[in-house]
Amino acid sequence: MGNEASYHSEMGTHFDHDEIKRLGRSFKKMDLDKSGSLSVDEFMSLPELQQNPLVGRVIDIFDTDGNGEVDFREFIVGTSQFSVKGDEEQKLRFAFRIYDMDNDGFISNGELFQVLKMMVGNNLKDWQLQQLVDKSILVLDKDGDGRISFEEFRDVVRTMEIHKKLVVFVDHGQED
């Protein structure tokens, strides 16, 4: 896994030396097969993630090299986006990327449907969900191109102060 402390300066994360060391210990605990990277199953071993329908999308975003697993560098960079010291724009971009599944800079009708389907499961019929998606696109799509840009997303979500809820705290408690 390398020297965890060097990641702060190398990658410009929002974590200090001690936080990176603590995250390194957490990463090692999660890395059940000791491969040096985290699979979806290893992420799902965390009770707080087991019920999160979007954990797969979060892993996709953390996994910048696209190999299906999250190594320590990807873990630190990804987690840093949720640091209390992280900025609003970074948090909003992360939230936008949850929906922008093809990473083209826009949320399409189909992408919004897929992500909302992950969240609601079978609680809504597909036609009901599609109505919700269509109405959402109509409201959010200010330029009328049929899709939601980051700017359109940001303008709406910023007023909800979602970025203040997208925070992770690194435990400063006693050593294990």
UniProtKB/Swiss-Prot annotation:
UniProt keyword annotations, A-Z: Calcium, Lipoprotein, Metal-binding, Mitochondrion, Myristate, Repeat
Residues engaged in binding Ca(2+) 4: 141, 143, 145, 147, 152
Positions of the record's site feature: Interaction with PxVP motif in substrates of the catalytic subunit: 118, 122
GO molecular function: calcium ion binding; calcium-dependent protein serine/threonine phosphatase regulator activity; phosphatase binding
Region entry Calcineurin A binding, spans: 131-136
Residues with lipid group (N-myristoyl glycine): 2
Binding site for Ca(2+) 2: 63, 65, 67, 69, 74
Binding site for Ca(2+) 1: 31, 33, 35, 37, 42
Binding site for Ca(2+) 3: 100, 102, 104, 111
Tissue/organ expression: Testis specific.
Domain EF-hand: 18-53, 57-85, 87-122, 128-163
Chief location category: mitochondrion
GO biological process: calcineurin-mediated signaling; penetration of zona pellucida
The UniProt record lists the keyword Mitochondrion: yes
Self-association and partners: Forms a complex composed of a calmodulin-dependent catalytic subunit (also known as calcineurin A) and a regulatory Ca(2+)-binding subunit (also known as calcineurin B). There are three catalytic subunits, each encoded by a separate gene (PPP3CA, PPP3CB, and PPP3CC) and two regulatory subunits which are also encoded by separate genes (PPP3R1 and PPP3R2). Interacts with SPATA33 (via PQIIIT motif).
Function statement: Regulatory subunit of calcineurin, a calcium-dependent, calmodulin stimulated protein phosphatase. Confers calcium sensitivity.
Protein family: Belongs to the calcineurin regulatory subunit family.
Protein name in the entry: Calcineurin subunit B type 2
Species this protein is from: Rattus norvegicus
The encoding gene: Ppp3r2
